[in-house]
């Protein structure tokens, strides 16, 4: 895949994360070299410019001698490589490098083309720096984690190779790459930027989208298992309100439930007038979820295509101007939006789970077992779902409101985008378990309604689960069933089995 700076779509970044080979468009070289020429001209004029021949942060007024400029950049990288915690997963690191390439290649950072080639070499040879997940406050960019990325270019620290962790210098040597000697401004350009928080937030976005699509599948299966009505999904209702996500979700639910024998069995003469909100209001809730994910996706797509360095080089005028593009507030807000979407999707799913185990609402045997009392059935999986949803509600607290000043109050407002994005991965794990539990229970409900049959799409989704998880008769160990159902959701196998083309998609 070609990385074309400024024009990448979400689908392109998804491909990078999933392991597609990525190479920067060579047409960017002229812009990169023009900006590097501006930096060289500033040094020729002996002009004091932040990040080129000055200190950093609160030390910006300290002038650095020409003989010390290479040491300045190296010291910057080493001193800022202060991250802690678990290493970021390889797919995220791969996306971090690709995002940094796309930003530098816009020709506003002043780095040399050979530095671009060194970064490209990490991707080409799958040399992935070990980047600790903790230590960034999301302004001035993701300094600590990007310093760890840059250390690998210098042959310092560890990288992830085919055989696990190894010395960066050894990995570079095996790939025929020499450790990079940083030129003026290059350390700052590599460290400044929102690429880590953006890569993590994109990962959270992609998982949230996949899981929320799965939530429509499990929600439809639950609706049929609980003998819910499809009348609330009538397109006329949703057209009157006008929200795109709501209309799309209603259309998906109509498609999923069309032709259900279970629905036809109670279409006439059903004494129930209205279903509980967790069934009836799925378009309104999940529509809002998808619209929120869409908004977050558009924000992150813009961020991924932008330049978040400082200062910025404007080659057409020869100016170098300090600003604040490193501030990741947009990413932090997007991460907070994704967190809200994940939390609400799980909250709605848990209420459907609770409905299924309650005979008063579902009309099914208590806890979905034919012999309640002797068997507990699905009693405790509902408790597990409640615990996971409670945790996600706590994690959904906005990260962006928790600014803590840094760098002796020079950097006195920060975004906290990076840990705001990191919590999305845990929240997605929790949601996938909740949906796995709903999948199991809704399928059990369908079995308890036999010989009535569900719709064709939901029937295929039910059948693929039954290939690895049998109907629950007597009580058995539940954890393996949850794990198998979760694997079908995370892999997309459940969605592929349903074969529904009407599920909403991100389009940024």
Swiss-Prot record:
Q: What is its main location?
A: cytoplasm
One GO cellular component assignment for this chain's record is:
cytoplasm
- Top-level EC class: lyase
**GO MF, any single term:** histidine ammonia-lyase activity
UniProt EC number: 4.3.1.3
Specify the domain of life of the species encoding this protein: Bacteria
Question: What is the reaction catalyzed?
Answer: L-histidine = trans-urocanate + NH4(+)
Pathway-wise, it operates in: Amino-acid degradation; L-histidine degradation into L-glutamate; N-formimidoyl-L-glutamate from L-histidine: step 1/3
Q: Where is this cross-link: 5-imidazolinone (Ala-Gly)?
A: 139-141
Location comes to: Cytoplasm
Q: In its UniProt record, which GO terms are filed under biological process? A: L-histidine catabolic process to glutamate and formamide; L-histidine catabolic process to glutamate and formate
Q: Which Pfam families match?
A: Lyase_aromatic
InterPro entries per the UniProt record, alphabetical: Aromatic_Lyase, Fumarase/histidase_N, HutH, L-Aspartase-like, Phe/His_NH3-lyase_AS
Q: How is it modified after translation?
A: Contains an active site 4-methylidene-imidazol-5-one (MIO), which is formed autocatalytically by cyclization and dehydration of residues Ala-Ser-Gly.
The UniProt keyword set, sorted, is: Cytoplasm, Histidine metabolism, Lyase
Q: Which residues carry this modification: 2,3-didehydroalanine (Ser)?
A: 140
Under the heading PANTHER family, the entry gives: HISTIDINE AMMONIA-LYASE
Record family assignment: Belongs to the PAL/histidase family.
Q: Which NCBIfam families match?
A: hutH, PRK09367.1
User: What protein does this entry describe?
Assistant: Histidine ammonia-lyase
- What lineage, starting at the top, does this entry show? Bacteria, Pseudomonadati, Pseudomonadota, Alphaproteobacteria, Acetobacterales
Name the gene: hutH
């Amino acid at each position: 895949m070609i990385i074309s700076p400024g024009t990448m779509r979400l689908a392109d970044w998804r491909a990078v994360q999933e392991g597609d080979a990525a190479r920067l468009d060579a047409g960017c070289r002229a812009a990169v070299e023009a900006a590097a020429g501006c930096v060289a001209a500033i040094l020729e004029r002996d002009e004091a410019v932040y990040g080129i021949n000055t200190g950093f942060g609160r030390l910006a007024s300290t002038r650095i001698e020409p003989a010390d400029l290479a040491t300045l950049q190296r010291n910057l990288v080493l001193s800022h490589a202060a991250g802690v915690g678990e290493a970021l997963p390889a797919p995220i690191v791969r996306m971090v490098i690709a995002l940094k390439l796309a930003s530098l290649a816009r020709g506003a950072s002043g780095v040399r083309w050979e530095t671009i080639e060194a970064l490209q070499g990490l991707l080409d040879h799958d040399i992935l720096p070990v980047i600790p997940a903790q230590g960034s406050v999301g302004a001035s960019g993701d300094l600590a984690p990007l310093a760890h990325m840059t250390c690998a270019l210098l042959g310092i620290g560890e990288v992830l190779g085919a055989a696990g962790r190894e010395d960066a210098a050894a990995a570079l040597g095996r790939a025929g790459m020499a450790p990079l000697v940083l030129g003026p401004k290059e350390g700052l350009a590599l460290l400044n930027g929102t690429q880590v928080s953006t890569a993590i937030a994109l990962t959270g976005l992609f998982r949230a989208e996949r899981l929320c699509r799965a939530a429509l599948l499990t929600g439809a299966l639950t609706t049929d298992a609980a003998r819910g009505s499809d009348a609330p999904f009538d397109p006329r209702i949703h057209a009157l309100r006008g929200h795109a996500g709501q209309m799309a979700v209603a259309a998906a639910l109509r498609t999923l439930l069309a032709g259900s024998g279970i629905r036809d069995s109670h279409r006439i003469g059903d004494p129930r007038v209205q279903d509980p909100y967790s069934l009836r209001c799925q378009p309104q809730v999940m529509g809002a979820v998808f619209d929120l994910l869409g908004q977050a996706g558009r924000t992150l797509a813009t961020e991924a295509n932008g330049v978040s360095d400082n200062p910025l080089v404007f080659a057409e005028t020869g100016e170098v101007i300090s600003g604040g593009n490193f501030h990741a507030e947009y990413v932090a807000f997007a991460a907070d939006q994704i967190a809200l979407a994940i939390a609400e999707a799980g909250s709605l799913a848990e209420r459907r789970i609770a409905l299924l185990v309650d005979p008063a609402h579902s009309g099914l045997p208590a806890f979905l077992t034919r012999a309640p009392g002797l068997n507990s059935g699905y009693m405790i999986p509902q408790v597990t779902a409640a615990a996971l949803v409670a945790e996600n509600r706590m994690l959904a607290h906005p990260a962006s409101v928790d600014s803590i000043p840094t760098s002796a109050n020079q950097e006195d407002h920060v975004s906290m985008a990076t840990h705001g994005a990191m919590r999305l991965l845990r929240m997605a794990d929790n949601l996938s378990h909740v949906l796995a539990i709903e999948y199991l229970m809704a399928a059990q409900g369908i079995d308890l309604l036999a010989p009535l049959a569900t719709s064709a799409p939901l029937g295929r989704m039910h059948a693929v689960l039954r290939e690895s998880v049998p109907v629950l008769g007597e009580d058995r160990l539940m954890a393996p069933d949850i794990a198998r159902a979760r694997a079908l959701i995370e892999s997309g196998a459940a969605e592929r089995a349903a074969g529904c083309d009407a599920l909403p998609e991100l389009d940024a």
